[in-house]
A protein has these predicted regions:
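Active-site loop-to-helix "anion-binding N-cap" substructures in soluble metabolic enzymes
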Residues: 1-34
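Short, well-structured alpha-helical patches and their helix-loop capping segments
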Residues: 4-8, 25, 45, 70, ...
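Enzymes that bind and transform nitrogen-containing heteroaromatic metabolites
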Residues: 10-18, 30, 50-304
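Proteins enriched for Cys/Gly/acidic motifs involved in redox and nucleic-acid/cofactor modification
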Residues: 26-56
Length: 304
């Protein structure tokens, strides 16, 4: 597989050929290279981060109760996989409701998990459908607590809780619109007086459709190539409506809620035939849970 960067793609091969060196392109390794290079290719060709949407849901498709409670839907093993993924990305994105409901830390904490959770990944990797080498590497990886992805909060919350894990240090950014910012600080002195330590980015856009473009530009400016979108439903819907989710990693637990919050609150489709059909789909068992992973488009996408 040639380097997707058009500035260098194929030049090394050509130099070798010019020097009389035989070069063989190992096509059998294409799937492996494609799985590992998707994010890099998008970043190089389109200048935007690669967005991975991770959700844990019940069998009937709920990520939380109507109260907002979501602890815990998935098993220890599945949550450990999420910490492995946090070790692989540059940023973790949440919306204001998740920020208020969960007080998330968004860091890598292998010490939170039992030996049983770790041992579930030592029993071999059983991937069905398309064999995904990114997932294989993720399953084998050890979560590294020294890696701290950038914490990203989208939207201005109604208030900042005392002792918020999100604001424990300076490795974060808050992205909101000027309209939302002005409305919230006018109503709440807690927000007006809070020290965001120059890590608040306020966008001038009024059109909601431009929100995600602004967010992606901010992430790029922070050096983010891969970002995990951890939700909740509202921010997932915002990214989904904008066509900005590249990879879906959905964990399904054998629980039935009966009612609750869906993973994506996006614009409805009139017909099921209009629903997004994913490519290169892989499924895997993680303890008692099932992981389903797929991509918005195939690897052979080009510059937009």
């Amino acid at each position: 597989l040639l380097d997707p960067n058009p500035l260098v793609s194929g030049r090394g091969v050509q130099r070798l050929l010019d020097c009389g060196v035989d070069v063989e392109i190992m096509h059998k390794f294409f799937p492996m290279a494609a799985d590992l290079l998707r994010g890099f290719k998008k970043y190089i060709l389109r200048g935007k981060p690669f967005i991975i949407n991770k959700c844990a849901m019940t069998l009937d498709g709920k990520i939380a109760a109507n109260s907002g409670d979501s602890r815990w839907i998935s098993s220890d093993s599945s949550r450990l996989l999420v910490h492995k993924l946090r070790s692989k990305v540059d940023a973790v994105i949440v919306g204001k409701n998740t920020f208020l409901n969960d007080n998330p830390s968004l860091n890598v904490r292998p010490g939170d998990f039992s030996e049983e959770a770790f041992s579930s990944f030592d029993m071999g990797i059983n991937l069905t459908g398309r064999y995904n080498f990114f997932l294989e590497e993720l399953f084998r990886a050890k979560p590294d607590p020294d890696i701290e992805p950038l914490r990203v909060l989208i939207g201005m919350p109604d208030y900042i809780p005392e002792g918020s894990n999100f604001f424990r240090d300076d490795n974060y950014v808050v992205i909101t619109s000027k309209k939302s910012y002005n409305e919230k600080i006018a109503k709440n002195s807690n927000l007006k007086n809070f020290d965001f330590r120059q890590r608040l980015v306020v966008g001038e856009y009024d059109d909601p459709s431009k929100e995600v473009d602004f967010i992606l530009e901010v992430l790029k400016a922070h050096g983010v190539m891969h970002a995990m979108l951890e939700g909740g439903s509202g921010i997932n819907g915002t990214f989904f409506n904008a066509g900005a989710i590249d990879m879906f990693m959905y964990i399904i637990a054998p629980k039935v809620a009966g009612n609750g919050i869906p993973p994506i609150s996006g614009a409805p489709v009139e017909k099921i035939s209009d629903a997004l059909l994913l490519y290169d789909v892989t499924t895997a068992s993680i303890g008692r849970d099932i992981l389903i992973c797929g991509y918005k488009e195939q690897y052979n996408f080009e510059m937009m």
